[in-house]
Amino acid sequence: MELGWLLVIGSYLLGSVSFSYIIAKKIKKVDIRQHGSGNAGATNTLRVLGVGPAVTVLLLDILKGVIAVVVTVQLTPDGDGWFAAAAGIAAIIGHNWPIYYGFRGGKGVATTIGVLASLVPLAAVLAGVIAIGSIVWTRYVSLGSLLFVTLTALLVAVLSQWFGYPVAYIYLTIIVAILSMWRHRSNIQRLLSGTENKLGRKKETT
């Protein structure tokens, strides 16, 4: 098997490591997926465990995305970005549907941040500033997450003629945006109905 595909598989396995699950088990002996929103990610960790564990989960989940694509870029220099893009998508899929935890994971936002910040940093930073601003203003993390992936995809498409982004990265951002929208479909419904949970408000049931 070609090295690039081995790296893609490895990225999925890396992405499947659920730090929110591990930390919740260690600190409170609970399954994070049975508490709060039921999501295995940093935002739900904040609701259930507090700021410290949530920041730890956020950074570790971002690191999964960074490691997956940076290692792949370094080891497949002639791949025209396709293996790096595939590795990034694989890491996000691993986070969302982890093989180690019955394919019940998170929504992949932090891992997505790691992937996009590593491969298309300017677009990710610009989109990130707007996304963070929207979270601060509305306190809707889901809205900020959706803005981040959507704006990154648009910016990569627009900026590619000046920055020479590989075509693979354009497809990557589109696929990542679609994945994120799918994972946030219930959040989108709640945003539209005005019932979405806001940052800082605890939610005790799934």
Swiss-Prot record:
A single MF term (Gene Ontology): acyl-phosphate glycerol-3-phosphate acyltransferase activity
Main localization category: membrane
InterPro entries in the cross-refs: G3P_acylTferase_PlsY
Assigned keywords, A-Z: Cell membrane, Lipid biosynthesis, Lipid metabolism, Membrane, Phospholipid biosynthesis, Phospholipid metabolism, Transferase, Transmembrane, Transmembrane helix
GO cellular component: plasma membrane
EC code: 2.3.1.275
Function statement: Catalyzes the transfer of an acyl group from acyl-phosphate (acyl-PO(4)) to glycerol-3-phosphate (G3P) to form lysophosphatidic acid (LPA). This enzyme utilizes acyl-phosphate as fatty acyl donor, but not acyl-CoA or acyl-ACP.
Name recorded for this polypeptide: Glycerol-3-phosphate acyltransferase
